UniProtKB/Swiss-Prot annotation:
Physiological role: Major role in the synthesis of nucleoside triphosphates other than ATP. The ATP gamma phosphate is transferred to the NDP beta phosphate via a ping-pong mechanism, using a phosphorylated active-site intermediate.
Species lineage: Bacteria, Bacillati, Bacillota, Clostridia, Thermoanaerobacterales
Subcellular location(s) per record: Cytoplasm
Originating organism: Desulforudis audaxviator (strain MP104C)
Residues annotated as binding ATP: 9, 57, 85, 91, 102, 112
PANTHER family on file: NUCLEOSIDE DIPHOSPHATE KINASE
Name listed for the protein in its UniProt record: Nucleoside diphosphate kinase
Length: 150
């Protein structure tokens, strides 16, 4: 089964949207296999956003993501990376489709509620940054046969 990393950013936590974000993904059928609330330090933020180092917005991005707690999670399911990206909506909330997380709750590109891995490789890297091996929980849900054909 595929896995992806999702993070409700400080604006989403402060606005009380963590439960709403999790609910949307669970109702879609994805399984939550790891979840933690944490305050990211500068070192972790810089490693997480390494691909943006040297860009004009890098320092502000790091400052923002370390400004308050985040909810980090790992979701599991078929085609979870691409489906989660679709459910989140465009990075710029003004361009996000209505009904997506960012289209419904996003305010500004710098305050867009949620982050999700953009590829399986990114998901593996980000999961490794935020979670130790023993923190991902393996379990069978009673409803899985109603979600997935075997």
């Amino acid at each position: 089964m595929d896995r992806t990393f999702v993070m409700v950013k400080p604006d989403g936590v402060q606005r009380g949207l963590v439960g709403e974000v999790i609910t949307r993904f669970e109702r879609r059928g994805f399984k939550l296999v790891a979840l933690k609330l944490l305050w990211i330090d500068r070192g972790l933020a810089e490693r997480h956003y390494e691909e943006h180092r040297g860009k004009p917005f890098f320092d502000e991005l790091v400052r923002y993501i370390t400004s308050g707690p985040v909810a980090a999670m790992v979701l599991e399911g078929r085609e979870v990376v691409t489906t989660v990206r679709e459910m989140m909506g465009a990075t710029q909330p003004a361009k996000a489709l209505p009904g997506t997380i960012r289209g419904t709750y996003g305010i500004d590109v710098g305050r867009n509620i949620v982050h999700g891995s953009d590829s399986a490789a990114s998901a593996a890297r980000e999961i490794g940054l935020f979670f130790a091996d023993g923190e991902l929980i393996e379990y069978e849900r009673a409803l899985d046969p109603w979600i997935y054909e075997r």
